[in-house]
């Protein structure tokens, strides 16, 4: 049970959990040790996912990650929440040396949330291009997006700031601006674009 895990890991603090998972806060400096011990001594041999979190620009600590470990023999999850000490330069230790499957999870968190995973063998963006200056899943990133210089292979205009969207594109949560469509069939629009977008007939 959770008390046995706490006694084995003196640095873990229990968290409230809405499900049956054992949930704990874990200091970043102990994350690798906790992952190794869960794998080797407690039979939590599967790292299911790593989810980056942003508590908001006014929060301190602001950034962190949630780790889910699963034991097939126990049919139980352990959830570790690890917050970054520095909100300006968020960083956590990489778990690639413990679980190879951490590779792409950490790259995604680095790409979209801007968390650096120290010790990662090849920490590169996985969705956005390398020169993209922002991290789209941060809470201060506008829902309507931001124009940014594109690599030559993507640019189709002289200043290379954006591409012309295909007819069914147009950014996140935009209604089609030209098609005739019933109100019940419209896709939702973000609050910061709805006011400026023309209404469909």
Tell me the role of every PLM-derived stretch.
Residues 1-201:
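Terminal low-complexity/charged segments
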């Amino acid at each position: 049970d959770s008390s046995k895990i706490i006694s084995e890991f003196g640095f873990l603090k229990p968290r409230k959990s809405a499900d049956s998972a054992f949930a704990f806060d874990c200091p970043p400096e102990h994350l690798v040790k906790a992952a190794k011990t869960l794998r080797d001594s407690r039979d939590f041999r599967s790292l299911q996912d790593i989810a980056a979190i942003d508590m908001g620009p006014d929060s301190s600590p602001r950034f962190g990650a949630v780790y889910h470990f699963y034991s097939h023999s126990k049919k139980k999850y352990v959830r570790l929440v690890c917050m970054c000490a520095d909100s300006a330069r968020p960083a956590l230790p990489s778990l690639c040396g413990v679980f190879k499957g951490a590779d792409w999870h950490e790259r995604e968190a680095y790409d979209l949330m801007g968390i650096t995973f120290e010790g990662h063998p090849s920490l590169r963006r996985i969705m956005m291009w390398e020169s993209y200056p922002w991290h789209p899943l941060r809470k201060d990133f506008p829902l309507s997006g931001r124009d940014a210089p594109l690599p030559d292979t993507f640019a189709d205009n002289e200043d290379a700031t954006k591409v012309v969207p295909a007819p069914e594109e147009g950014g996140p949560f935009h209604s089609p601006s030209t098609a005739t469509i019933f109100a019940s069939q419209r896709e939702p629009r973000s609050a910061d674009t709805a006011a400026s977008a023309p209404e469909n007939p």
